[in-house]
UniProtKB/Swiss-Prot annotation:
The keyword Chaperone does not apply. It is found in: Cytoplasm. NCBIfam families: glnS, PRK14703.1. It is an enzyme of class 6 (ligase). It holds the Pfam family tRNA-synt_1c. It comes from Haemophilus ducreyi (strain 35000HP / ATCC 700724). GO terms for biological process: glutaminyl-tRNA aminoacylation; glutamyl-tRNA aminoacylation. InterPro entries: aa-tRNA-synth_I_CS, Gln-tRNA-synth, Gln/Glu-tRNA_Ligase, Gln_tRNA_ligase_bac, Glu/Gln-tRNA-synth, Glu/Gln-tRNA-synth_Ib_cat-dom, Glu/Gln-tRNA-synth_Ib_codon-bd, Glu_tRNA_lig_a-bdl. The lineage of its organism: Bacteria, Pseudomonadati, Pseudomonadota, Gammaproteobacteria, Pasteurellales. A motif ('KMSKS' region) lies at residues 274-278. GO terms for molecular function: ATP binding; glutamine-tRNA ligase activity. It catalyses: tRNA(Gln) + L-glutamine + ATP = L-glutaminyl-tRNA(Gln) + AMP + diphosphate. This is Glutamine--tRNA ligase.
Length: 556
C-alpha cells in the first residue's frame, strides 16, 4: 500500500468480513477492495468511530485496496465545518490517510436529484403532502401494517411538477416530501414508503444556499457508495434492516454495475460510557464537561487529551475484533491497552501529589544524582535529579506508627528514596491542629545504589522531589464520568454523573518536567501515567492529566 493512501500498519484479525472479501476476490466478484469511512459531521468522533475507522482503513490496507473519507452531510441544520475539521484531524491522528481528497455526499447532490427524478419517472416515487404527524400515523407499527397515503397515486407528470416546486422553494418545511413507492404493508417499517427528500431552508457548509431540498441518509448513502465504486460498505448492526432499502434504491436506478453491498457488524458498547452524539452534546451544552475534548469524554479528542496514544486505540480495536453479536466491552480492556503502551514507552519521572516537607538534617550540600528515564530502555538515557536538604514526599508515605505491612517511612525507621539514599525519620513538627508540617530525617551517605554496609534491611522505596529545585504542578485525577455501568439507558444522564469524576490536586514534579511536551506520556513513579494537558498546560502552567492508573482497578 502506498504512503499516500495509508500511513499506519494495522494488524487485523480474520473475521466474517474478511472471509466474505476472500470469497469475493476468489470468485472474481471483485478484483479489488474499496471501503469508506462515512461520518456525519454533526459532532466529534468517539471511541465507537475508532473501531469503524480501524476496520475500514485496516481492511483496505490488508487487501492493498483503498479507503475514502466521505462526509455524509445531508442535514445542514446539525452539521458544521468545525466537525469536519475535527474528524479529519482525528482520522489522521489515529494514523490513517484517506484516498485522494475527502469526499462529501453533497458533491453528489446533482446526481442524487437526477436519480430521484428517474424514480419518479419509473412510477417508484411520489410527492406526499401528509403532515409529519399524519405520516407517522399512516406508517403503522411493528404489528400493524401501514396504509397508503391519499397522495400515493398521483401521476408521474404531477409528481415531477411537484418535486420541481419543492426544489424551487414553493413548499414550506414539513408540508411536502418525496417518498419511495414500495410497500406500506411490508414487515420492515423502513420499506414502508420511506422519505427520500425533504424541504429544509438551511445554509449548507459546502453548497451554500443552492438547495432547499435535501436527500435522506438512506437514499444518499447507497448511491454515494456506488458512485465511488465502493465494493464493501461496512455499517453497524442498527442499519441491518436499512440494507433492504439500500439494495432497493440501487436496483431501481441506472447506475454502474456491479453494485456495492452492505455488511453489518456490531457497534462498540463500552462499559460506563455514552456514544450517543445527542447525549454527548448535552454534556457539553449543560457544562458538565468543558468541551468535546474533555478528558472524561469518550471522544477521540478527549481520549487524546487524556493521554491515550493512537497505537493504544488501534490495539484496543484489534483486540475487541469484529462480530455480528452485540456485547459490552469492559472499560478495563481499553485501559489495559494504554497501560501496556505507556509501560513500554513512557519515560519515568517523579511527582509528589500530596506533599509533606522533609528536612534531611545531615545533608550539607546539594548533589546531582542520575536516574534512568526508563528501567528497561537504556537508549532513552538518564536525567539529573537534584538531591537537596529539603525534599517533598507524599503524605501517605509517612506514619508515626505502623505495622510491619507498611513498607514506607515510619518514625524511627528507614526507607529508601527512589534513585537516591536511605533516610531515617527522626522527629516531626506539627501545627496547632496536630497536622504534620515537617518530617526531620537523617540520611546514610553510603547507600547510593547499594544496601547499608552493616547489612540492615531496608525494604520500602518511596518517591520524592527536591523542595528547592522543582516545578509546581496541578494534577487532574480523572475517574469514570458516570456512576452507572450503562448511562445510555438513563432518562436523565445528569442524574448519574459521578461527582468525583475529576479531582484536582496541587503538588510538585521534577524540575526536568519544565520541558514536558504536550501529549507525551510519563509514568509518575508509584502514582500513575500522566500527560501534560494539551489545552491548558504549558511550561509556565504545568497541568498533568491522569491517563490511567499503574494497575487495574485503581480509583482516586
Amino acid at each position: 500500500m502506498s504512503e499516500e493512501t495509508l500511513t499506519t500498519e494495522v494488524e487485523t484479525r480474520t473475521n466474517f468480513i474478511t472471509h466474505i472479501i476472500d470469497e469475493d476476490l476468489a470468485s472474481g466478484k471483485h478484483n479489488n477492495v474499496y471501503t469508506r469511512f462515512p461520518p456525519e459531521p454533526n459532532g466529534y468522533l468517539h471511541i465507537g468511530h475508532a473501531k469503524s475507522i480501524c476496520l475500514n482503513f485496516g481492511i483496505a490496507q490488508e487487501y492493498h485496496g483503498k479507503c475514502n473519507l466521505r462526509f455524509d452531510d445531508t442535514n445542514p441544520v446539525k452539521e458544521d465545518i468545525e466537525y469536519v475539521a475535527s474528524i479529519k484531524q482525528d482520522v489522521e491522528w489515529l494514523g490513517f490517510k484517506w484516498q485522494g481528497e475527502p469526499r462529501y455526499a453533497s458533491d453528489y447532490f446533482d446526481q442524487l436529484h437526477g436519480y430521484a427524478i428517474e424514480l419518479i419517472e419509473k412510477g417508484l416515487a411520489y410527492v406526499d403532502e401528509l403532515s409529519p404527524e399524519e405520516m407517522r400515523e399512516y406508517r403503522g407499527t411493528l404489528t400493524e401494517a401501514g396504509k397508503n397515503s391519499p397522495y400515493r397515486d398521483r401521476s408521474i407528470a404531477e409528481n415531477l411538477a411537484l418535486f420541481e416546486k419543492m426544489k424551487n422553494g414553493e413548499f414550506k418545511e414539513g408540508t411536502a416530501c418525496l417518498r419511495a413507492k414500495i410497500d406500506m404493508a411490508s414487515p420492515f417499517i423502513v420499506m414502508r414508503d420511506p422519505v427520500l427528500y425533504r424541504v429544509k431552508f438551511a445554509h449548507h457548509h459546502q453548497t451554500g444556499d443552492k438547495w432547499c431540498i435535501y436527500p435522506m441518509y438512506d437514499f444518499t448513502h447507497c448511491i454515494s457508495d456506488a458512485i465511488e465504486r465502493i465494493t464493501h460498505s461496512l455499517c453497524t448492526l442498527e442499519f441491518q434492516d436499512n440494507r433492504r432499502l439500500y439494495d432497493w434504491v440501487l436496483e431501481n436506478i441506472s447506475i454502474e454495475r456491479p453494485l456495492p453491498h452492505q455488511y453489518e457488524f456490531s457497534r462498540l458498547n463500552l462499559e460506563g460510557t455514552l456514544t450517543s452524539k445527542r447525549k454527548l452534546l448535552q454534556l457539553v451544552t449543560d457544562g458538565i464537561v468543558d468541551g468535546w475534548n474533555d478528558p472524561r469524554m469518550p471522544t477521540i479528542s478527549g481520549l487524546r487529551r487524556r493521554g491515550y496514544t493512537p497505537a493504544s486505540l488501534r490495539e484496543f480495536c484489534r483486540r475487541i475484533g469484529v462480530t455480528k453479536q452485540d456485547n459490552v466491552v469492559e472499560y478495563a480492556a481499553l485501559e489495559a491497552c494504554i497501560r501496556e503502551d505507556l509501560n513500554e514507552n513512557a519515560p519515568r519521572a517523579m511527582a509528589v501529589i500530596n506533599p509533606v516537607r522533609v528536612v534531611i538534617e545531615n545533608v550539607a550540600e546539594p548533589e546531582i544524582l542520575k536516574a534512568p528515564n526508563h528501567p528497561n530502555r537504556p537508549e532513552l538515557g538518564e536525567r539529573d535529579l537534584p538531591f537537596t536538604r529539603e525534599i517533598y514526599i507524599d503524605e501517605a508515605d509517612f506514619r508515626e506508627e505502623a505495622n510491619k505491612q507498611y513498607k514506607r517511612l515510619v518514625l524511627g525507621k528507614e526507607v529508601r528514596l527512589r534513585n537516591a539514599y536511605v533516610i531515617k525519620a527522626e522527629r516531626v513538627e506539627k501545627d496547632a491542629s496536630g497536622k504534620i508540617t515537617t518530617i526531620f530525617c537523617s540520611y546514610d551517605p553510603e547507600t547510593l545504589g547499594k544496601n547499608p554496609a552493616d547489612g540492615r534491611k531496608v525494604k520500602g522505596v518511596i518517591h520524592w522531589v527536591s523542595a528547592t529545585q522543582n516545578k509546581v504542578a496541578e494534577f487532574r485525577i480523572y475517574n469514570r464520568l458516570f456512576n452507572v455501568a450503562n448511562p445510555g439507558d438513563e432518562e436523565d444522564i445528569n442524574a448519574v454523573i459521578n461527582p468525583s469524576s475529576l479531582i484536582v490536586k496541587h503538588g510538585f514534579v521534577e524540575v526536568n518536567l519544565a520541558n514536558a511536551q504536550k501529549e507525551q506520556g510519563y509514568q509518575f513513579e508509584r502514582e500513575g501515567y500522566y500527560c501534560l494537558d494539551s489545552k491548558e498546560g504549558s511550561a509556565d502552567n504545568l497541568i498533568f492529566n491522569l491517563t490511567v492508573s499503574l494497575k487495574e482497578g485503581f480509583t482516586a
